[in-house]
């Protein structure tokens, strides 16, 4: 089973008219809300400082973008950039939570911010400090009465829990690399996990010793997502197109978004840290692959 690339890829490119996004646009979070696709993308200008831009579209392929970033470095710990946004809609609470990586010369910090309108964001705080930790994403509902989030302590995917999104604990490893496989060096979370009757469908990325990124998927227990139910040996996508193979980071495809609309999974991804592409598949097909593949 493989994802199907959109023929019009890439769907978002750098905009030379705006300095803050003139060099690279990539690694985006996307949600579908009120009939629209809302995209939050990482952008870089010639200063290589990452900022987060916003774009919106009705069909999932064509987007109109704001001319100014909606999130940019303001704190010392994010002086070199705010990166790789993943956005979760907490529908029962009427708010959205963005997980993003703050970068400074002092290291990286996995941060959370919240919004009620998708444009104005208020920082909540970090998942953890003082360690190399990123690729975090919030689950779309509480599990056992607590918020849950994936994160990455290299080289593995971990999970953590919180009562208030500010204080995190109960850290548990979910899964790590597999020797001699496509995900042999490290793994990291993808977009927001998808709840199904068979478990949490969790797309993720893997990285091998030849420095190639690929996408995979696993199935996790609904009430204990640290328990892996199934993890196929094969991947669902690898770099093939020229713009996926050549760029700021060669052979890199990186997804932080997989919204489901009318039974279709839309997988948005950065291509070689330069542009944004889209691939898709039927949710039923992806779930079957995760269970049986």
Regions found by a protein language model. Name each.
Residues 1-80, 89-185, 194-251, 261-265, ...:
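Beta-rich carbohydrate-recognition and catalytic domains
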């Amino acid at each position: 089973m493989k994802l199907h690339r959109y023929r019009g890829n890439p769907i978002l490119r750098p905009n030379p008219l705006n300095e803050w996004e003139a060099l690279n646009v990539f690694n985006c979070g996307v949600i579908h809300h009120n009939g629209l696709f809302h995209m939050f993308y990482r952008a870089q200008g010639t200063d290589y400082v990452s900022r987060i831009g916003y774009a919106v579209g009705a069909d999932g392929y064509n987007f109109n973008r704001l001319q100014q970033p909606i999130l940019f470095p303001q704190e010392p710990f994010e002086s070199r950039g705010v990166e790789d946004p993943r956005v979760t809609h907490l529908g029962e609470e009427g708010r959205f939570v963005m997980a993003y990586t703050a970068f400074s010369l002092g290291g990286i910090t996995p941060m959370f911010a919240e919004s009620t309108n998708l444009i104005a964001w208020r920082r909540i705080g970090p998942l953890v400090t003082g360690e190399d930790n990123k690729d975090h994403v919030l689950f779309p509902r509480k599990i056992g009465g607590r918020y849950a989030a994936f994160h990455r302590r290299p080289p593995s995917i971990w999970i953590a829990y919180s009562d208030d999104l500010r204080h995190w604990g109960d850290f548990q490893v979910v899964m790590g690399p597999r020797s001699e496989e496509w995900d042999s060096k490290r793994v990291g979370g993808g977009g927001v996990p998808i709840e199904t009757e068979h478990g949490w469908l969790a797309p993720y990325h893997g990285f091998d010793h030849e420095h190639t990124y690929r996408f995979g998927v696993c199935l996790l227990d609904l009430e204990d997502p640290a328990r892996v139910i199934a993890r196929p040996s094969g991947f669902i996508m690898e770099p093939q197109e020229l713009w996926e193979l050549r760029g700021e980071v060669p052979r890199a495809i990186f997804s932080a978004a997989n919204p489901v609309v009318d039974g279709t999974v839309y997988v948005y991804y950065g291509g070689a840290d330069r542009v944004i592409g889209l691939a898709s598949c039927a949710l039923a097909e992806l779930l079957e692959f995760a269970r049986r593949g």
